[in-house]
Amino acid sequence: MHKMMVVEKERSIEERLLQLKNQNDDSECRITACVILSTFIAVCGSFSFGVSLGYTSGAEIGIMKDLDLSIAQFSAFASLSTLGAAIGALFSGKMAIILGRRKTMWVSDLLCIIGWFSIAFAKDVMWLNFGRISSGIGLGLISYVVPVYIAEISPKHVRGTFTFTNQLLQNSGLAMVYFSGNFLNWRILALLGALPCFIQVIGLFFVPESPRWLAKVGSDKELENSLLRLRGGNADISREASDIEVMTKMVENDSKSSFCDLFQRKYRYTLVVGIGLMLIQQFSGSSAVLSYASTILRKAGFSVTIGSTLLGLFMIPKAMIGVILVDKWGRRPLLLTSVSGMCITSMLIGVAFTLQKMQLLPELTPVFTFICVTLYIGTYAIGLGGLPWVIMSEIFPMNIKVTAGSIVTLVSWSSSSIVTYAFNFLLEWSTQGTFYVFGAVGGLALLFIWLLVPETKGLSLEEIQASLIREPDRINQS
């Protein structure tokens, strides 16, 4: 009897979710100055994220020389950011739901500012590592809350574009480090990493809270005020507000979120997709290549100064392609294109180092390696760099978004920490073998994306829940 009641309840929820489809509201299609400003303020944290990711590439020689660090000590320093981010990820979801999206970003900014200043004024490895962990914890918080916040405030027809600006600003931070790391001291670079955090601290006073979070905590009046600011003062926000409230109440009544809830059959599919994309993003080598681009170029015999400068110049235009295409092509085609490019270029980098080891074409392999590294980073930037976070922010319903988002973010940063720490040692083992492994992961990733990743282009968050309600049937039930 109880089982029949549960089935009937889920069927009722499904029917009500499906009623939300095919509803449209012109006010939801408006792009207002408030949405643009709110997105810009949110992605200021993403710029600091990018600076942190590329910092070890631009500052490696200076830090190791000034503080007399060994390779093992510097590898530990590089990986501590991702270790700290994994710690931050554990609390990111809970903080985002208890404090709200804006206050969570404030906490992140405080931790990042402390971290960057500790690095900038470090006199020994202890303060250097403390700063790296502190800023890492802040990045762990912001890596979850920024894409979620942007997805929750954006009109559905441009949600992918706006959420992908998270990746664009990450690439801007990377570009700044790659370019300016050639002539700025590593301490100055650290201070530049803190600058966008100060901008965000001030800017958050002028942007609204997420309407979906306000609905979850029962602040109906604030929900309407937030939507009016986001959609325009003359917009009719009644239908969108109603859909958000109905969806929130349905998922709240359906079940209260707990860790065990994630493994229910109806959530298993989205959890597999979210975690799978994060594992693909990291074990295809992205963190390693971005963090140690200068090391790779140096091993290939290419000028680090020229290579870093050119990578910095190309970084932002590459990410712009993803911003333009994400709501035109859709998530799946862009992911498949991105991962295909990363797979091919990883294999080609492996071939280049194989030729170098065999002492064949010595005058061509440095340039060939640089071209392949540039294409690898470019194909990463247009898809796999940002889309896992875009999709993560879309596919989880409100009642499990906190727990699921925290787990997915934790997986991302934990795997990134492993790859970042191990990369230098992998290069000592076999440079070409390392990139062949990355290429093989890319090949498996193509199969995963083709079979499992859903298309969410053009759907509201409520419509995505309706479309995914039957997706557990795609996963083999045990």
From Swiss-Prot:
It is a multi-pass membrane protein. Expressed in leaf vasculature, stem and flowers. InterPro entries: MFS_dom, MFS_ERD6/Tret1-like, MFS_sugar_transport-like, MFS_trans_sf, MFS_Trehalose_Transporter, Sugar/inositol_transpt, Sugar_transporter_CS. CDD domains: MFS_GLUT6_8_Class3_like. The keyword Transmembrane applies. Its main location: membrane. It comes from the Eukaryota. It is found in: Membrane. GO terms for cellular component: membrane. Keywords: Membrane, Sugar transport, Transmembrane, Transmembrane helix, Transport. The chain crosses the membrane at residues 31-51, 71-91, 110-130, 133-153, 162-180, 188-208, 270-290, 306-326, 333-353, 367-387, 407-427, 433-453. One of its GO terms (molecular function) is sugar transmembrane transporter activity. Sugar transporter. Belongs to the major facilitator superfamily. Sugar transporter (TC 2.A.1.1) family. NCBIfam families: SP. This is Sugar transporter ERD6-like 18. It comes from Arabidopsis thaliana (Mouse-ear cress).
